[in-house]
C-alpha cells in the first residue's frame, strides 16, 4: 500500500516532551507497533491497525535509558528468536513481545564500551536482517559540521559464558567489498596495490579494513592523495596488539589482561581475544572484536 502524509498528528501528547517514535509492522498480532520515549527513563508501546488510531498497551521504565527507543526481533545461529528493546545510548534489554507488552527481566546491557555512538536506527524492508546505523558524537574540529554516521552493522544473538549478548557485525556487503593489500604472512606490503587502487569499493571514503592476526609490523597509506598513515603492530612476546594513526597510538589491546585502551580511555574486556576488525576512515577508528560481541569507536 502507499502511505499518504496527513496534515495533523495522530497521537496526542502523552508527556510534555515525548518524542522519537519508531513504527514497525508486527505480523503475529496483525498491527503496527510504535515505541515512544515518554519522559526520564520511561517508554511507551502503542499499537494500531490503520496508523491513525493508536492505543497505548505498555509503559516501561529502564534504568539510565532514554530517547530513541527501538524494539526488534533477533535470532541466534540456530534460529531461536529473542526480542530486544533498545535506547539511544546503546543500552539494550532482552525479553519477549506479544504485540502488546514487552516482558523483560529489566537487566541493562551495553552495546558499546564507550559513549561515542548514539541514537542508532534500524531499517525496515531488509528481509530477515536487522541492520543498525548509529550517529557518532565527534566534534570534528576545524570543520563546519558535527558528528558522522557509523558503520552499518547487522544485529543477531550470541552467547558468552552462558549469557545472551548482542552480536553486531559489519554488514556483509562491506565484507564482500574488501580487497587484500598484503600476503598471508603479512611480512610484505604490496605497495603497488595501495598506490594504484582503493582498498575498498568506496574510493571517496578511503576506507580500509583488515583482520589482524599477525606477528609482524606493517603500515600503509590509504591512497596517494591522503596524509593518513596507519600502522598496526603485534608484539608477540607481550601479547599486545596496537594501532596508530599518523604516529598517534589510538588502540592498544593486552591479550593477557584483557585491558583495552582507546585514545585516552581504558576498558577491561575479555582476555585472549584473537579476532579483531579495525576500520579506519579519516579520523575515525571502529573496532569489532570477539565475533562481533565487542564494539568500540
PLM features: residue spans?
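Residue-level detector of Asp-centered blade-edge/turn motifs that repeat once per structural unit
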Residues: 25-30, 73-79, 125-128
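A short loop-to-beta-strand structural motif that recurs across blades of beta-propeller domains
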Residues: 42-44, 91
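Loop/turn-rich, solvent-exposed surfaces of beta-rich toroidal or solenoidal domains
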Residues: 70-94
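Surface loop/turn signatures of beta-propeller and other carbohydrate-active proteins
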Residues: 1-25, 36-37, 54-73, 103-120, ...
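Conserved Ser/Thr-centered positions that define the repeating blades of beta-propeller domains
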Residues: 1, 45-48, 96
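Beta-rich accessory regions
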Residues: 100-115, 124-297
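Conserved beta-propeller blade signature
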Residues: 33-35, 82-86, 131-133
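Short, solvent-exposed loop/turn segments at conserved positions within beta-propeller repeat blades
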Residues: 37-41, 86-87, 145-148
